[in-house]
């Protein structure tokens, strides 16, 4: 007997007013029927709601900040350990890759993989880049900016991921 398992009512949004996005970065969290047919979910079941509020840590969305002194990337990688992550800089791009093999979780077995690529500003000092992973799974990539008259090096190199013992609070805009 096939039984459809519905997502809990408190995790549903207001249909077309706040539609879900199929390509949101939920690493292996699974798809629901409203992800595939968002326009039908509110017409088939008017009481069917998706969550209105998703925090940065729950959504896996990255945040990029670039101010006068530094360039910072925050990325939620809570399902990955530092050994599962590879961060490298090549030319004007930073590439963050995460992959872990199949492992057991509460619902069965799962494997995850992602690849993100960000363009670095031309005035970031690539020789002083750092990357750390907090206890709550927030990856922080940081690079100081140099004065505009100096030239930055653009050779490919790997950036080691260090582990922090304290959790990182969600980045605020």
UniProtKB/Swiss-Prot annotation:
Compartments in which it is found: Cytoplasm; Nucleus
Consequence recorded when altering residue 54 to L: In CTRCT9; uncertain significance
Keyword field contains Kinase: no
GO terms for cellular component: cytoplasm; cytosol; nucleoplasm; nucleus; protein-containing complex
Modified residues (Deamidated glutamine): 6, 50, 90, 147
Residue ranges annotated for the sHSP domain, each copy included: 52-164
CDD domains with a match to the protein in the record: ACD_alphaA-crystallin_HspB4
Binding site residues for Zn(2+) 3: 154
Tissue specificity statement from the Swiss-Prot or TrEMBL entry: Expressed in the eye lens (at protein level).
Organism domain of life: Eukaryota
Stated consequence of mutating residue 119 to H: In CTRCT9; uncertain significance
Binding site for Zn(2+) 2: 107
Residues noted as binding Zn(2+) 1 in the record, renumbered to the chain: 100, 102
Paired cysteines (S-S): 131-142
Region (Required for complex formation with BFSP1 and BFSP2), start-end ranges: 1-63
Record site: Susceptible to oxidation: 1, 18, 34, 138
Modified residues (N6-acetyllysine): 70, 99
Keywords: Acetylation, Cataract, Chaperone, Cytoplasm, Disease variant, Disulfide bond, Eye lens protein, Glycoprotein, Metal-binding, Nucleus, Oxidation, Phosphoprotein, Sensory transduction, Vision, Zinc
Residues carrying Phosphoserine: 45, 122
InterPro entries attached to this UniProt entry: A-crystallin/Hsp20_dom, Alpha-crystallin/HSP_16, Alpha-crystallin/sHSP_animal, Alpha-crystallin_N, HSP20-like_chaperone
Disease named in the record: Alpha-crystallin A 1-172 is found at nearly twofold higher levels in diabetic lenses than in age-matched control lenses.
Family: Belongs to the small heat shock protein (HSP20) family.
Subunit structure, interactors included: Heteropolymer composed of three CRYAA and one CRYAB subunits. Inter-subunit bridging via zinc ions enhances stability, which is crucial as there is no protein turn over in the lens. Can also form homodimers and homotetramers (dimers of dimers) which serve as the building blocks of homooligomers. Within homooligomers, the zinc-binding motif is created from residues of 3 different molecules. His-100 and Glu-102 from one molecule are ligands of the zinc ion, and His-107 and His-154 residues from additional molecules complete the site with tetrahedral coordination geometry.
Protein name: Alpha-crystallin A chain
Source species: Homo sapiens (Human)
Lineage of producing organism: Eukaryota, Metazoa, Chordata, Craniata, Vertebrata
Gene name tied to this protein: CRYAA
